[in-house]
Amino acid sequence: QKLDQVAIPDFAMGAMENTGLVTYRETLLLLDPIAAAPDERVNVATTIAHELAHMWFGDLVTMRWWNGIWLNEAFATFMEVAACEAYRPDWERWTSFGVERSGAFDVDSLDSTRTVEFEVRSPADADGMFDVLTYQKGGALLRMLEQYLGEDRFREGVSHYLRSHAYANTETNDLWDAIEATSGEPVRRIMDTWIWQPGYPLVHASLIDGSLRLSQQRFRFGSAYTESE
């Protein structure tokens, strides 16, 4: 029932979400209340919100294996923005998140991109999961799902997920099960394509003889449009 937040001199990492004791690099927790620049305030608030989110996503409920690390980090990324948006709407964190997300779009447009979740067989594979696809793309997918379901139904599903798996391990299917159970929506059918397929779609619209025709393909840098599915 107690949570301490500690600034540590020369802390190698940015911050670490130990249960009940979050440790930070000094510059990510301590601010001059008078002289701190607006960007510093946003950065500190974002970091604190991210680490506090891990008390639920990562500590209370932990992924079964490293392939599911997005369940921890994408939720923490989503919650850091949502919390700051509620705390200081004037910061417009969802707007700035759109800029942050662009880094994931860039990576996801390469032929060498990966899926959000893939089989982890080695420490190197696990280390490779900590990138913009896990954090920014994963957070953007959760935001997309929230906007599809509506804030209340999304929150109800996530709460059911946390309550059902408290102090236990989960995988992505457990999240979809929980949200489907409370919302009645085909969440797995919608979201699995985003989690298990690389890239993102480019939708092409054309007007042919008075009829609107829609098609899509995976977007790639330097690729000319060719009609697919």
What are these regions (language model features)?
Residues 1-217, 221-227:
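Hydrophobic alpha-helical and helix-loop surface patches within well-folded domains
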